[in-house]
């Protein structure tokens, strides 16, 4: 009899074998992790993550909890996440932290290193679990070696979270596909940024055609032309410093979508400090692209504003992992996810890979957390292929190194931020004169 991974009472007690589930998770996890060069790690993590379900106690537990055999006795400890972690450590002793930390925490969250070591030391591999042979060791070493050329010590915890994100989302998605096929069917492929660009182009052309020939509109057009001209630049850090009234929202969106098209990037994530601005920005985006193509993920989302029940369900599901072409969220949601250890928040991280991040009103980034925020953005740009666009009316100092007499005053910024609007444009003076 095959090892049970899931039982679906709604489908006449259908059983998903642990082999099918593990293979499904491995396939998805490998696909996600391949985006940043660690596909083999994703595959092995997926194959090992539920090895503990082979335990006799777990098989009894799942039969009882599902209702298949409600009166069956459970003999002993039925926890399972630690088993795959111990197997990973045994099979891959030198590189196991990039597997075992994700596996042992795939339900309860990532442990810090001390707690991880303590938890691992409490257990042994159960005798009723089969330990497979080690495979793909050389491939994993090669993947890690390529990344290590650019990694610094502070980058590794983000790499751990990213691998964790791949495993957690893959586990959720494969389980959902078996337990709730109707919901899973809503996760069909979304429209791409390439397909969305004509909508933006048409919208901007209509505005231009109807707009009177005024000084303000000429400045806005000038800003947009600069965004078009610089959008083909390499992935990296950019800033768009445009005073209020200069058309910053549409210009930044134009730059982001063209930059994404240039580099084959998958999505645009717009992070905004205030929910009032988010609602306004999202409304503009929906008028351009359609509400079905813009995901709002913040506390002020009004479900009643979405009349289509199917679309509402799709949006709720997409907010779990940000698998959407355009995401509008808060700074808090973005940075809490990047620095969290919880499955629900980390789940979306792998969908930030190869994305354009627009940080609106960059001057509002909290001073007390500015160093870890900047360090995180540098890691995501270097290791995970993102580009970051800071937009503001008055750009804060985020580049270079600032040294003070107090250690807390020391700030290591971004080496280079490419300003889209040259100083000679003097937009502040021009807009001040025409108001």
Please provide the spans of the model-predicted regions.
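Walker A/P-loop
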Residues: 103, 234-259
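Accessory nucleic-acid engagement/destabilization modules that flank
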Residues: 2-203
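Interdomain hinge/linker at the junction between the two RecA-like core domains of SF2 helicases
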Residues: 394-435
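Conserved pre-motif I regulatory segment
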Residues: 15, 21, 28, 40, ...
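Inter-Walker segment of RecA-like/P-loop motor cores
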Residues: 290-339
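Conserved Walker A/P-loop ATP-binding site and its immediately adjacent core
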Residues: 251, 256-258, 264-289, 296-301, ...
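SF2 helicase catalytic motif II
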Residues: 327, 331-335, 343-383, 388
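Pre-Walker A (Motif I) flank of P-loop NTPase domains
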Residues: 233-240, 266-267, 323-324, 432
């Amino acid at each position: 009899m095959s090892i049970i991974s899931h039982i679906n009472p709604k489908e006449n007690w259908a059983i998903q074998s642990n082999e099918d589930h593990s293979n499904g998770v491995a396939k998805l996890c490998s696909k996600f992790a391949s985006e940043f060069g660690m596909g083999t790690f994703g595959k092995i993590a997926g194959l090992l993550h539920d090895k503990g379900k082979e335990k006799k106690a777990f098989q009894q537990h799942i039969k009882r909890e599902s209702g298949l055999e409600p009166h069956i006795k459970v003999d002993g400890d039925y926890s399972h996440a630690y088993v795959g972690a111990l197997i990973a450590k045994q099979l891959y002793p030198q590189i196991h932290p990039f597997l075992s930390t994700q596996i042992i925490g795939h339900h309860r969250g990532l442990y810090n290193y001390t707690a991880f070591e303590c938890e691992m030391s409490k257990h042994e591999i159960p005798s009723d679990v089969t330990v497979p042979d080690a495979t793909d060791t050389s491939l994993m070493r090669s993947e890690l070696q390529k990344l290590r050329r650019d990694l610094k010590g502070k980058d590794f915890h983000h790499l751990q979270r990213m691998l964790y994100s791949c495993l957690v989302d893959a586990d959720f998605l494969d389980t959902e596909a078996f337990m709730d096929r109707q919901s899973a069917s809503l996760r069909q492929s979304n429209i791409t940024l390439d397909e969305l660009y004509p909508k933006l182009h048409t919208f901007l052309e209509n505005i231009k055609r109807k707009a009177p020939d005024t000084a303000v509109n000429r400045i806005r057009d000038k800003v947009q032309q600069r965004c078009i001209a610089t959008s083909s630049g390499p992935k990296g850090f950019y800033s768009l410093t445009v005073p209020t009234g200069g058309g910053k929202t549409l210009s930044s969106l134009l730059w982001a979508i063209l930059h994404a098209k240039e580099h084959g990037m998958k999505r645009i994530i717009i992070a905004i400090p205030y929910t009032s601005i988010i609602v306004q920005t999202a409304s503009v985006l929906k008028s351009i692209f359609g509400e079905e193509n813009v995901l709002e993920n913040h506390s002020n989302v009004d479900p009643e504003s979405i009349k289509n029940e199917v679309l509402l369900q799709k949006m709720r599901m997409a907010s779990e992992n940000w698998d959407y072409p355009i995401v509008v969220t808060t700074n808090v949601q973005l940075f809490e996810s990047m620095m969290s250890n919880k499955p629900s928040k980390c789940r979306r991280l792998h969908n930030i890979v190869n994305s354009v991040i627009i940080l609106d009103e960059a001057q509002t980034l909290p001073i007390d957390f500015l160093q870890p925020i900047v360090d995180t953005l540098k890691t995501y740009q270097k290791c995970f292929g993102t580009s970051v666009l800071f937009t503001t009316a008055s750009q804060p100092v985020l580049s270079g190194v600032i040294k003070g007499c107090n250690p807390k005053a020391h700030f290591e910024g971004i080496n280079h931020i490419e300003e889209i609007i040259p100083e000679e444009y003097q937009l502040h003076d021009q807009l001040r004169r025409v108001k």
